[in-house]
């Protein structure tokens, strides 16, 4: 009678997981449900009834699961995917929903652990498993850093890549222009690309578009009718296009290491493909931004990137809610001296 819950951040991936779980469990007579922010009220009430009665055994959901009105009966296992995208309080809220005499097992999955999580693997009683090999047929993504003043040089490269049958992401950190920030926007970049090259078929996807508009752009990109998809970080998870071989990130200095690594992972997913990621930056790089760029050029290993992120940002609070910041150790260093913790 125990309930298993799998939590994802993106609605697209939730539907994929639900489809996969339904296929795996089709002969087991195990009832499962999907709960997202788009779930209609009538359907939600039916799902909640199943949770209260214990009829529902597996619940797959997004942040919607955190709502107070969602009841979790006999919760025995919590699987949190893309763990770096969830806050401490959110994960704690799930445990608050459980029976007082039942503490569920928890499995956290992440390609790039946040500093606090990495520190917890050293201090806390956590069992850690690492998959430190690339999937079969996958090659590391080559990463380079360029000043935004050289962005015109990328047009020819885009045209060559697309003529060879591959596709590219052009990622921006903002949708529309801001009076306070000097950054490249998605809408302006799409217009600029179309003006620079009549050969490129350019699409656009961001959070302000309707669901139908987003689905249309994403499907056209997957089908290959769009060469370059101008986008925001909405494509960080859940976007699997094996034909995409180039990721260009505008104003990369504004993004964290974990996010940069996740975005880079959107390309090079095809068999034996050599993919590239270009990080564009505006103005002079600060010390922290330069350290992030160097880390991205240096390695494709998510765990190594997490260690560098820990060094840059600090470990945060093991018993608090801060997920980064200094631990104020006077002599010890968490990364350098990790082997002493076991002793």
Protein language model features and the residues they cover:
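Conserved interdomain linker/interface between the two RecA-like ATPase lobes of SF2 helicase motors
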Residues: 125-189
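SF2 helicase catalytic motif II
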Residues: 66-108
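Conserved motor-coupling elements within RecA-like helicase/translocase cores
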Residues: 38-59, 69-75, 211-227
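Single conserved hydrophobic/aromatic residue that forms the stacking wall/gate
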Residues: 1-12
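Conserved helicase motor
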Residues: 32-45, 62-68, 175, 203-214, ...
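Loop/turn-to-beta-strand initiation segments
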Residues: 31, 54-58, 74-77, 101-107, ...
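Conserved nucleic-acid-binding Ia/Ib motif block in the N-terminal RecA-like helicase ATPase lobe
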Residues: 13-59, 199-204
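C-terminal helicase module of SF1/SF2 nucleic-acid helicases/translocases
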Residues: 151-166, 185-192, 196-343
């Amino acid at each position: 009678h125990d309930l298993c819950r799998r939590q994802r951040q993106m609605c697209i991936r939730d539907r994929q997981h639900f489809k996969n779980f339904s296929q795996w469990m089709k002969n087991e007579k195990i009832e499962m449900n999907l709960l997202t922010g788009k779930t209609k009220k009538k359907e939600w009430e039916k799902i909640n009834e199943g949770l209260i009665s214990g009829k529902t055994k597996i619940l797959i959901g997004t942040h919607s699961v955190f709502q107070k009105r969602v009841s979790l009966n006999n919760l025995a296992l919590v699987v949190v995917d893309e763990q770096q995208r969830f806050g401490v309080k959110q994960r704690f809220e799930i445990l608050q929903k459980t029976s007082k005499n039942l503490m569920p097992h928890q499995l956290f999955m992440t390609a790039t652990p946040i500093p606090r999580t990495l520190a917890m693997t050293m201090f806390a009683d956590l069992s850690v498993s690492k998959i430190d090999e690339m999937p079969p047929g996958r090659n590391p993504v080559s990463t380079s850093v360029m000043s935004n003043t050289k962005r015109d040089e990328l047009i020819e490269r885009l045209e060559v890549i697309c003529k060879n049958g591959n596709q590219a992401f052009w990622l921006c950190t903002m949708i529309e222009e801001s009076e306070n920030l000097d950054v490249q926007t998605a809408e302006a970049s799409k217009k600029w690309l179309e003006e620079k090259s009549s050969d490129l078929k350019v699409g656009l996807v961001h959070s302000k578009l309707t669901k139908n508009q987003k689905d249309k752009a994403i499907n056209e990109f997957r089908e290959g009718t769009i060469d370059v998809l101008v986008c925001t970080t909405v494509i960080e998870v859940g976007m699997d296009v094996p034909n995409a071989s180039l990721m260009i990130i505008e104003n990369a200095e504004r993004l964290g290491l974990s996010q940069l690594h996740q975005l880079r992972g959107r390309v090079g997913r095809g068999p034996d493909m050599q993919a590239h990621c270009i990080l564009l930056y505006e103005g002079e790089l600060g010390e922290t931004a330069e350290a992030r760029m160097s880390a991205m050029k240096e390695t494709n290993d998510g765990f190594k990137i997490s260690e560098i992120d820990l060094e840059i940002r600090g470990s945060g609070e093991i018993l608090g809610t801060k997920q980064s910041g200094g631990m104020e150790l006077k002599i010890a260093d968490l990364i350098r001296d990790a082997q002493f913790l076991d002793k």
